[in-house]
UniProtKB/Swiss-Prot annotation:
Protein name per the record: Anaphase-promoting complex subunit 7
Localization per Swiss-Prot or TrEMBL: Nucleus
Regions of compositional bias (Basic and acidic residues) in chain numbering: 519-533
Location of the region described as Disordered in the Swiss-Prot/TrEMBL record: 519-558
Composition-biased stretches (Acidic residues): 535-558
Lineage: Eukaryota, Viridiplantae, Streptophyta, Embryophyta, Tracheophyta
Species this chain originates from: Arabidopsis thaliana
Keyword Repeat on entry: yes
Pathway(s) served: Protein modification; protein ubiquitination
Major location (coarse): nucleus
One Gene Ontology CC term in the entry: nucleus
Alphabetical list of PROSITE patterns matching this protein: TPR, TPR_REGION
Subunit structure: The APC/C is composed of at least 10 subunits.
Amino acid sequence: MEVPKEQIATLIEHGLYDSAEMLGCFLVSSPTVSAETSPQLKAENLILLGDALFHQREHRRAIHTYKQALHHYTRIPKQSSGISRSSLSLSTRSSVNASSISAINENEVRFKIASSHFALNETKAAIAEMESVKTRSLEMNILMAKLHRNSGYNRGAIAFYKECLRQCPYVLEAVIGLAELGVSAKDIISSFTQTSNRSAKVSLDQIDPTRWLQRYVEAQCCVASHAYKGALELFAELLQRFPNNVHLLTETAKVEAIIGKNDEAIMRFEKVRSIDPYTLTSMDEYAMLLQIKCDYSRLNKLVHDLLSVDHTRAEVFVALSVLWERKDARTALSYAEKSIRVDERHIPGYIMKGNLLLQAKRPEAAAIAFRAAQNLRSDLRSYQGLVHSYLAFGKTKEALYTAREAMNAMPQSAKALKLVGDVHAFTSSGREKAKKFYESGLRLEPGYLGAVLALAELHLMEGRNGDAVSLLERYLKDYADDSLHVKLAQVFAATNMLQDSLSHFQAALRINPQNEAAKKGLDRLEKQMKGIDPDATDENDENDVEDVDGDTEEAELM
């Protein structure tokens, strides 16, 4: 043979895929191997080229090449093939020798075709390819689970995830997948003790003698069922056993962010970065928290660091969107959309897109984004976004239904109760009900300032300014929070107590110099105190429009 195919296998084994692809082109074009007289050799050569393309992520070319190989394989005379039909694919995983070159496996080829379709978001084609594979490896089963889940075939996804755990109980992505699909911890754990051939059982003590894996399953099931307090307790127990575990710290920070423990979540994410400064997982969630705290210097540094690690990841595009929101909403939206194009199952991308569309007064489009996030995995942010989107375009019934759905899913969540209150507060006839829901939220979680601010706003709308002041001053004794000072300043401004208003805007800015509401409120108040109409349009402001190019290179953003 003019081109030794074992050399291509060696190149692939050592990760030299560019060279393997170039050499593969020589191999498949060699006239010494005829498709008519040597279909098996032709198939083997094409598989080698396909493997090089597969590893280069040239998935469309890989699919085409593998299918050519399968076509030639069907032409191999059965009596002279010397191998069974189920063993067509070249194995490059073991040491390269003459026997490994000719030992090929059809199932492996079909798996790679399906994996390429999956990478191209062609789920149906991937499933169709895998259905012809009857005996599946662990990696084949995890792919099938993902494919079925992406297609909405949850029962099939559950079955394949469970099969993964029967083959190996430590496939943690299968544990998370099952938890998110509503499978109980007991049911998941029972899969550990069944072997893949279903003919024997092993004890849980053999698999998980210290029970950490069982606790991990329980924690993920708590997260999926919105039992966040239980999840935090279980993650804390695991962290005592595995301190400085980046994955556990990240999972804990995400739960803390969901329940509004923003300061704790920020500290947790900082610890993650101190242990592993190059991790990208959930760093967009961290960026959102920094934005809430108006900590723009840390946000800017975070985005700069993420870009230097990998500028192609969905998390990085969401973080860029967060950074640009204050400067240019259009550019921010384009980055949120890029994150979804990179990974169409990346929930923070949809949340960010929904928030930006809502701010741009496009509630119908925002609702679509929040619904997409909700379909992937329901959490409080998608519920909140949907409710506020529905209210913004007058769909009060839909808003109330969604808020109640959140309350039923999270009965111990003060935020969910507040969400129902927000819908009732939208109409004058529902304000008394809103008050009851806000107060119920505060009984459930006395330190939940979101309910305090909503209740104060309700008092203000009803003309009970004194009640609003009393409520806010009472909470300020225990919580030195800038948002409480801003709301109190707004109440005083509404009652023309301008000096008191000034003092609380200033107090808010002392706590958080980046608080945008305090800055705008103070500017407006100072105009009032000077006798200038704060609503008058400044001609200079009208002309001061910056033209920002939405396609600015990431490297220039800092």
